[in-house]
Amino acid sequence: MLPYIVLVLGCWSVLSQAAQTDDEERAGNRRPIWIMGHMVNAIGQIDEFVNLGANSIETDVSFDDNANPEYTYHGIPCDCGRNCKKYENFNDFLKGLRSATTPGNSKYQEKLVLVVFDLKTGSLYDNQANDAGKKLAKNLLQHYWNNGNNGGRAYIVLSIPDLNHYPLIKGFKDQLTKDGHPELMDKVGHDFSGNDDIGDVGKAYKKAGITGHIWQSDGITNCLPRGLSRVNAAVANRDSANGFINKVYYWTVDKRSTTRDALDAGVDGIMTNYPDVITDVLNEAAYKKKFRVATYDENPWVTFKK
C-alpha cells in the first residue's frame, strides 16, 4: 500500500508542477492589459473605479497662471454620460492617491498600479512648460512620494497634449535630480496625447532627450466615433526594430465591440468610463487566452510586441 501511495503522490507532484508551469507559460504569452479608469478626479472615485476592475486611472491636472498644478479638474465638455465638474485640490488628491497605493495603508488598493496624469497645459504659454514640470515634480515628491520615504508605489505617466511643451519633461527630471531623488524617474513614463503624427511625436522626444518609458495614446471622446488607423501606426512603431514607442493605449472605450477591436489591434491599455465592460471582454474565451490584467510585477516600460 505504501509504494502505491508514494507513486500517487509522486504523480500528483509531477502533474501539479506541470500545471503550474503551464499556467506560468500561459501568463507569459498573454499580453498584459492596463484597464485605465477615465477622468478619476475625486478621491472617492479611486475606489469606485478600482472596484469596477481598473488597475490604472487617468486624472486631469489643471494649472494656475503661474504654472502651479492646481486642481484635478476636467471641466465642460467631457465624455457623454459623465459629471465633468468633480475635482480636488491637486495636493489633496495626491495624498489620497498615496494612501491608495501604499502597502500597509488602510486605504491600500493592491490592483492600482499605474496613474496617467492628463496635464492640461493648454492654459500655459510655451515658455512656462519647463517651470510647470519643475513644480509638478515638487508636488509629487512631497505629497505622493512622501519625499522618498515609503510613498505611493504606482507608476506614473505624464501625458502632455502639446508637442511644444516637451520642456516640461526636462523640468520635471531636473527638479527630482536637484531634490536628491533622480531614482524616482524609474517610476515615470511619458505620453503626448494630441493625436499628432507619430513621426512628429518622435521628434519631440528627441528634443526632450527621452528614450524609453514611452506610452502612446490615441483616441477621442466617447461621444464621437474614431477609427484605428493611428492606433495601427502606433502599434507598428512599437513593434518595429527602430520604433520609439513602448506601449499603446486607446481612449475612450465604453463599448464591448470597440474593446474587441482595440484588443485585436494589439493595444496595451484601454481607457474607459466602464472598467467592468473591459473586464467582461477580457474574460471572454477568445480573449482570455491572449490577454490578462497587468499587475504590479509588470514593468509598464517594457515592450510586448504583437
Curated annotation (Swiss-Prot):
- Effect on the protein of changing residue 74 to A: Loss of catalytic activity on sphingomyelin. Loss of catalytic activity on sphingomyelin and lysophosphatidylcholine, and high decrease of hemolytic activity
Protein activity control: Catalytic activity and hemolysis are inhibited by divalent ion chelators (1,10-phenanthroline, EDTA, and EGTA).
Propeptide span(s): 19-26
Q: Which cysteines are joined by disulfide bonds?
A: 78-84, 80-223
> For binding Mg(2+), which residues are annotated in this chain's numbering?
58, 60, 118
Q: Which cellular components does GO assign to this protein?
A: extracellular region
Instruction: Please name the Gene3D superfamilies in this protein's record.
Output: Phosphatidylinositol (PI) phosphodiesterase (3.20.20.190)
Required co-factor? Answer: Mg(2+)
Q: Where in the cell is it found?
A: Secreted
- GO:BP terms for this protein? killing of cells of another organism; lipid catabolic process
Domain of life (superkingdom): Eukaryota
Signal peptide per UniProt = 1-18
To which protein family does this belong?
Answer: Belongs to the arthropod phospholipase D family. Class II subfamily. Class IIa sub-subfamily.
**Known function:** Dermonecrotic toxins cleave the phosphodiester linkage between the phosphate and headgroup of certain phospholipids (sphingolipid and lysolipid substrates), forming an alcohol (often choline) and a cyclic phosphate. This toxin acts on sphingomyelin (SM) with high activity. It discriminate between the number of carbon atoms in the substrates, since it prefers SM with six carbons in the fatty acid chain (SM6:0) to other SMs (SM12:0 > SM16:0 > SM18:0 > SM2:0 > SM24:0).
Q: What is this protein called?
A: Dermonecrotic toxin LiSicTox-alphaIA1a
Q: Which organism is it from?
A: Loxosceles intermedia (Brown spider)
